[in-house]
Design a protein with these regions (language model features):
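Acyl-donor (CoA/ACP) binding surface of acyl/acetyltransferases
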Residues: 1-27, 31-37, 70-193
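Conserved GNAT-fold acetyl-CoA-binding loop/helix
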Residues: 37-60
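A short helix-loop-beta-strand connector motif used in the catalytic cores of GNAT acetyltransferases and
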Residues: 60-72
């Protein structure tokens, strides 16, 4: 497992680098995160407006657990988004919840598809994880497409799961699994009909 002190954590991809956030990323973080369209597809943990105090709190680890691999997405030498998994605990320690966002400048150009593919492959191998899950707001079909293109399967919908300023929304549930064969127990297959 990575730690908050692991500043050397770098994952290279095609045209991008995933790395730990740094204090000198503050201006770039504010530039991309304060766009009013960015938080529309995210939970309200992602504030708008995104203030300097919000950025400082995030970079200091007061918003998310920086012991988890919360990485900056760097394109063209600047941080322009974030991607992370939050590993489960106890009996769920081999599964994790995936979250990500990228600045609007990079939307619609295939960046997140490549970034999610690279990051999830790295996380599943390195941590190790057998399941990575993501929830997608019903109004964010682009994010659902990113997941589907990276081997995620839509498992269902959590109805009326999230209250946003414009009303209640469903959350679509996606997962990518890669369990070792020795661990799989086909419980459902052996259950009486």
């Amino acid at each position: 497992m990575t730690t908050a002190m692991d500043e050397s954590l770098i994952v290279h991809g095609e045209g991008f680098v995933l790395r730990r956030w740094r204090p000198d990323d503050l201006c770039a973080l504010l530039r991309h995160a304060n766009d009013p369209l960015v938080p529309r597809g995210l939970s309200e943990r992602f504030p708008h407006p995104y203030t300097r105090a919000d950025g400082e709190a995030f970079l200091e680890g007061r918003v998310v657990d920086v012991r988890d691999p919360v990485l900056a997405i760097e394109i063209d030498g600047q941080a322009c988004g974030s991607i992370a998994v939050r590993p489960g605990q106890g009996e769920r320690r081999y599964s994790a919840e995936l979250g990500y966002w990228i600045g609007r400048t990079y939307w619609g150009r295939g960046w997140m598809t490549r970034i999610v593919g690279t990051y999830v492959a790295w996380a599943m191998q390195t941590l190790p994880l057998y399941r990575v899950q993501a929830t997608v707001l019903d109004t964010n079909p682009a994010s659902a497409t990113v997941l589907l293109r990276n081997g995620f399967v839509e498992e269902g919908v959590s109805r009326c799961a999230l209250l946003k300023p414009d009303g209640l929304h469903d959350l679509r549930v996606f997962a990518r699994v890669n369990p070792p064969a020795a661990v799989c127990v086909p419980v459902c297959a052996s259950a009486p009909a």
